[in-house]
Amino acid sequence: MAAQRELYDAIVIGAGIQGCFTAYHLAKHSKKVLLLEQFFLPHSRGSSHGQSRIIRRAYPEDFYTQMMAECYSLWAQLEHEAGTQLYRQTGLLLLGMKENPELKIIQATLSRQGVEHQCLSSEELKQRFPNIRLARGEVGLLEVSGGVLYADKALRALQDAIRQLGGIVHDGEKVVEIKSGLPVMVKTTSRSYQAKSLIITAGPWTNRLLRPLGAELPLQTLRINVCYWQEKVPGSYSVSQAFPCFMGLGLSLAPHHIYGLPSREYPGLMKVCYHHGNNADPEERDCPAAFSDIQDVHILSGFVRDHLPDLQPEPAVMEHCMYTNTPDGHFVLDRHPKYDNIVIGAGFSGHGFKLSPVVGKILYELSMKLTPSYDLTPFRISRFPSLGKAHL
């Protein structure tokens, strides 16, 4: 078949936000690129669906805050190219106890990196945001440039751009076999392809593709409950009322972050979620028998009742999303330990969407054997000492 003889510069497996930005950078640099997606687009099986994500520079680590500087400009560039709004500035409010160490570290990082922010006392918070109820000793850190990314619009814009730049997008094609070598061979349910390099951005399916290639990453796949809460007075927590996105840090009732953003999906509802979930195989994420524990919803109900009194304290809508977590919460951006023309982008741990413009650029650079634009030490596979040679 002609398709088998055709040689691509790169094949990208997985058309979530990371794979789309990787293919976009490849196509922008005039590379012959094929983007493969096992499901028909758009779909809600992975980690990139839905209408909204938080964008922020507020991180404890300098390297993420530095990467975000370029991400903001690349998001703006995509907005301009697509002729549609992909980002809305709302501000990001971090809530925590005054002595919370993570809050202090984030504030220090923002100061060091020259990111505009404001430290708000309990009194100032009450004046600025009267519909947030605070516990005694809670303070706020407002990152001015934080806001909302329109996730579904971003995916569509990228897929359109890839095609316009000459890239090829094939959905409804599941990869069934990868043969390492030069060229690398990729067999799907429809046909076979070959390429000089392969980039795997397969989210919770990553290890299914890596195991036959002699590698396995320490990835934990979680099903997240995405909860929407009804406003008692419509509009009280809306963008039009200048209500920000928020993150609750170090809360006594919640071992993990709680985050929220003004809802665009459902008018009159606000998205408030817990940054953790239950272990789940991505193939079985919709099986109710697998998920008896909805402790996170109880945690969220308590938070809403205590902090957001103008919301009903029970979720009105609950949807699902997948996280693919690493032990340290940092990404994997690296070449396969044995095959240097196979590149892996994985383990985005529930905070990768906003960083995808730079992640895609890095994966493009790795696949083309270019010097990466950023120090990849935090993202190397070798940081996992438990991965002995037997795994690789």
From Swiss-Prot:
Its cofactor is FAD. Coiled coil: none annotated. The modification S-8alpha-FAD cysteine is found at residue 321. It is found in: Peroxisome. GO terms for molecular function: flavin adenine dinucleotide binding; L-pipecolate oxidase activity; sarcosine oxidase activity. It catalyses: sarcosine + O2 + H2O = formaldehyde + glycine + H2O2; L-pipecolate + O2 = L-1-piperideine-6-carboxylate + H2O2 + H(+). One of its GO terms (biological process) is L-lysine catabolic process to acetyl-CoA via L-pipecolate. FAD binds at residues 9-39. The modification N6-acetyllysine is found at residue 126. InterPro entries: FAD-dep_OxRdtase, FAD/NAD-bd_sf, MTOX. One of its GO terms (cellular component) is peroxisome. A motif (Microbody targeting signal) lies at residues 390-392. Belongs to the MSOX/MTOX family. PANTHER family: PEROXISOMAL SARCOSINE OXIDASE (PTHR10961:SF46). Metabolizes sarcosine, L-pipecolic acid and L-proline. This is Peroxisomal sarcosine oxidase.
